[in-house]
């Protein structure tokens, strides 16, 4: 199992495939399948039947993409970057961009022991 460094709400860029170079926000992360749904990327058309609640028709929606095909966007430069983990002086664990050293986001309430 791959260690997931991508979280919901992160800004990512697609690095391979049909949507290469397209940027978007992570909408959902599927931990078991190592996939993410990125807004505006990997669009598929789904045919739905009409029922009591909604009309039928063709719906365009995002489909999951493997996490190896996306990379974080460096907050400083706007280019793709790898992610590292670092502990701050107050003991909180954060994700940082390897290229610029900028903080991408906090990991949680983890405390260094």
Curated annotation (Swiss-Prot):
GO terms for biological process: translation. The keyword rRNA-binding applies. It holds the Pfam family KOW. One of its GO terms (cellular component) is ribonucleoprotein complex. The keyword rRNA-binding applies. Keywords: Ribonucleoprotein, Ribosomal protein, RNA-binding, rRNA-binding. GO terms for molecular function: rRNA binding; structural constituent of ribosome. Belongs to the universal ribosomal protein uL24 family. One of two assembly initiator proteins, it binds directly to the 5'-end of the 23S rRNA, where it nucleates assembly of the 50S subunit. One of the proteins that surrounds the polypeptide exit tunnel on the outside of the subunit. Part of the 50S ribosomal subunit. This is Large ribosomal subunit protein uL24. The gene is rplX.
């Amino acid at each position: 199992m791959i260690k997931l460094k991508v979280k919901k709400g992160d800004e990512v860029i697609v690095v391979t495939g049909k949507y290469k170079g397209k940027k978007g926000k992570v909408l959902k992360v599927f931990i078991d399948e190592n996939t993410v749904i990125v807004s505006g990327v990997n669009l598929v058309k789904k045919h739905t039947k009409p029922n009591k609640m909604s009309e039928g028709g063709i719906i365009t929606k995002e489909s999951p993409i493997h996490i190896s095909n996306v990379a974080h966007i460096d907050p400083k430069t706007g280019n793709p970057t790898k992610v590292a983990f670092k502990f701050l002086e107050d003991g909180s664990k954060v994700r940082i961009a390897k290229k610029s050293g900028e903080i991408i986001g906090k990991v949680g309430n983890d405390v260094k022991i």
